[in-house]
Amino acid sequence: MNKNAIALAADSAVTIGKHLAIHNSANKLFALSKIEPVGVIIYSNADFMGIPVEIILKQYKSAMGDKAFNTLEEYVSDFFAFLLQHTELFHFHNNEKPYVQSVYIDLLKGLTGDYQHSIKKKESEMQRNLTPDELAIIQHDAVCATLKFVDNIPPLPGLDLTHYIEATYSHEICEHITHNFPWITAEDLAALVKATCSIFNRLFFRNGYVGLAFAGYGKNDIFPKMVHIHLSGIVNGKMRYYQKERVSITESQNATITPLAQTDVMQTFLFGINDSFIQEIGREIPLQIANSIQKVDDTFFAEGKKQNVQQELNTITTGTVQSIIQKAQRQYLRPITQSVATLPIEELALLAESMINITSIRRRVAIDDNIGTVGGPIDVAIISKCDGFIWLKRKHYFDRAYNPQYFYSHYMIKSPNYGDLDNNPV
């Protein structure tokens, strides 16, 4: 986006299960209002608490009517209020228990993995089966690792669900743990149940979330904005979500490009390298340094200096990684954003569509776990302060010629942001 407008583009691929099937017919880009210049892109999960997100968004759009807000952030707040006020309509209460189960089961899968990995590693080192005492140590250590993992997860601000989860689900959680980990001691069981109940107050969305990127203008917004939300679920009438990022065009920030969902290809285009490679460099080099130094005889170092050498090399590695990031921003990203700042609206839309296309090409030809997960028709829209939400490309599952009633029913509200019925589908 730049000072003139924000361009939104989304593909149509949706994955069923673990690559059991891929359909290229999903709708991911929507106008949030029939009148105001606001849109939203969805990604990751297509369902929220068992309800298709598309249905929720269209119900909200219908309920909004001609309502307008001063800022984009107020649209986001109003959407959340709509969800909480219509829990009966969407039957969220019926899906609370399956949602809670999905959260704590996903957490405890990590304990299973840690426990099994530790046993295999220890047996490989010892070249024999482990004794009961050795197993007990590994079991306790695995529980402690899970407790530490939970403790290190940042809290979700303003959320207090622990007492409700303890009162409603602690017995169920306790039964699940004792069934799957019959070896657990009473002391470890109590600590693990308590930690599991507290996970609902923390930023733990590993079981899945709905990605929502709200974009556009409030009445008092002169430049475009984007508010990027991860929405996990509703428990006891409270929303589990966090704001991933907020992007605004200002007098000093002239342009920005914000990849969503599968970001690796777009990051490579923008930076010359993607986050996963940078993180891998940051992990692998210190590990190689540690292994190499351990192989060097202690006599080559002055007394007490071996650890200092390793720490200094790790510091140099961290500095090198930061230097790579800065160079990528300077040599790759900055020239592109400088160009985006001056792009006319139609070129802005073409760039947004091209970002999806290059990712789609990569997913189509690369034989990896993500093959085919981006593809199908691309929906493209432009939102500007003066013209509002304008579709440039939009797929329909039906033929327009046979369904004129659809378009007439969607164009009953007249607005300066919209043209005639034939030119601007909502």
Positions of PLM-derived features:
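N-terminal nucleophile
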Residues: 1-426
